[in-house]
Amino acid sequence: MAKGGGKKSAAAARAAANRLLADNRLARHQYDILETLETGIELVGTEVKSIRAGQANLRDGFCLIRNGELQLHNVHISPHTHASGYFNHDPLRVRRLLAHRREIDKLRGQLDQKGLTLIPLNLHLQGSWIKLTLGLGKGRKLHDKRAAEKDKQIKKETRAALSRY
């Protein structure tokens, strides 16, 4: 007798291998995201364990290009609870991001424009690798935020009205 859940288990395995670990929802409210880029991130072992446990906060994070390298600043990854103090990592250390040289050069050219910044949008698993999605964003003014919120509300009401009929 054959097992009946082969496809479900494979789909569940793929979903588990590509799951979202941390999300910066505030960034999409504060910035207009013009372009996104997926990069690798250089981590130590206790950081990987903490991120997989959901102990990462991207809210105050930003990225800079220094000495030709992409660097992630001000992202808090909590110390691993089951590691001793000696072997644990610094929660706010500067982390190196892994991207191709041409991608970094392209970003440097775009960042030279006034008002653009690199913001971490989310951390996710891609197979066994932890990836960081960066967004090239332009800061929104207060009236832009209000207009975006109003547009979002109108679209929501329109969808609800159309679904009733």
Swiss-Prot record:
Keywords per UniProt: Cytoplasm, RNA-binding
Compartments it resides in: Cytoplasm
GO cellular component, one term: cytosol
Any one Gene Ontology molecular-function term assigned to this protein's record: RNA binding
Main localization, broad class: cytoplasm
InterPro entries: SmpB, SsrA-bd_prot, SsrA-bd_prot_CS
BP GO terms, sorted: trans-translation
Ranges that cross the membrane: none
Domain of life: Bacteria
Family statement drawn from the similarity comment of this UniProt entry: Belongs to the SmpB family.
Biological role stated in the UniProt entry: Required for rescue of stalled ribosomes mediated by trans-translation. Binds to transfer-messenger RNA (tmRNA), required for stable association of tmRNA with ribosomes. tmRNA and SmpB together mimic tRNA shape, replacing the anticodon stem-loop with SmpB. tmRNA is encoded by the ssrA gene; the 2 termini fold to resemble tRNA(Ala) and it encodes a 'tag peptide', a short internal open reading frame. During trans-translation Ala-aminoacylated tmRNA acts like a tRNA, entering the A-site of stalled ribosomes, displacing the stalled mRNA.
Designated name of the protein: SsrA-binding protein
Organism: Synechococcus sp. (strain WH7803)
